[in-house]
Amino acid sequence: MKKIVAGLVVVLGFCACAHRTSGTLDVNKALDYCAEQTQRSLVELKGDSGIDYTMMPRNIMTDEHHWNCRKATKEEWCAGFWPGVLWYDYEYTQDKHILEEAEKFTASLEFLSRIPAYDHDLGFLVFCSYGNGYRLTKNPAYKQVILDTADTLATLFNPIVGTILSWPREVEPRNWPHNTIMDNMINLEMLFWAAKNGGNPYLYDIAVSHADKTMKCQFRPDYTSYHVAVYDTITGNLIKGVTHQGYADSTMWARGQAWAIYGYTVVYRETKDPKYLDFEQKVTEVYLERLPEDKVPYWDFSAPGIPDAPRDASAAAVVASALLELSTYLPNGTGKRYKDAAIEMLASLNSDSYQSGKSKPSFLLHSVGHWPAHSEIDASIIYADYYYIEALLRLKRLQEGKNVIK
């Protein structure tokens, strides 16, 4: 109990002053920091007995200083982010040692292309790892893993509902006959990619159907999102919306809205259908207008205890990355505003208030995984680091006059 109370004191102490954070952003210096932390993580993972490439960094809790690792299994949805961090770090540094480590960690996920789908997280698992690996190396074996995994993900699609079943494991325990979570929007990118890179063209149709049904059923009239949409498998109709990892079913869970912003940016990129661009801006505006001063959201926009509620750096990193891409699809005024907002978010994440610095080998502090389950509260979490370094690389490309998507 003393440990829990102490942790809460740390959380509340941070939150009370976090809104005063300010800073500037030197993108190369920020990427250098990420490179240093990545090397530090690899040294730590090696230890005395060498690296176990099946064990992936997942989190570092508030009072800890070393990665908690989890085995790369079909159930461990975050296992693709650490290989993805290594690929992004290699993209920046061109360090051959980092390339070798990225390849070894990525190889631990190949089995996912050969087994039935456990849930929708195959995109996070395989596209963050093998997707980035193929983008940077054009290894044909990587391409085949992605194509095979996309076909596996497609087996969860229900044509009556029109979406992918996100959590098969929750169908009976929660009486959620067909459930679709907002996180699932991110995994559509792998389907779009596969459809235009030698996979079944039907994968494109699945992604579009999923995006359309989610747009219709998983948002409130004010464009805030539900985390989970529960559907009837016979009629395909919506039964209810649930905010499983947020504060309440009526509130805007920060990372859920972040997934929506990122996901619909990808859908517009792949379809060029203006309805998605219009919708995307509405979803983005309701997020931006409710942010605190430093542009890093509370874990839920209606969380109890605001302004002392914990922030979620992971949501800020996801949105910053998405906005940098979205800014390139919009006229100068709106596009510039979104780009500037993304830079403000990254500047805050680049500050002492959010960076791990010498205290931990992660990039960022202060993310919230699952508050209602008392899990990963005010922690360093690997997906925050993944989207942070992705956003920095996107900003660097923009500053160099290159396409934001490489």
Which residues make up each language-model segment?
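Bacterial Sec-dependent N-terminal signal peptides
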Residues: M1-T24
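Glycan-recognition and catalytic cores of secretory/periplasmic carbohydrate-active enzymes
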Residues: R20-K406
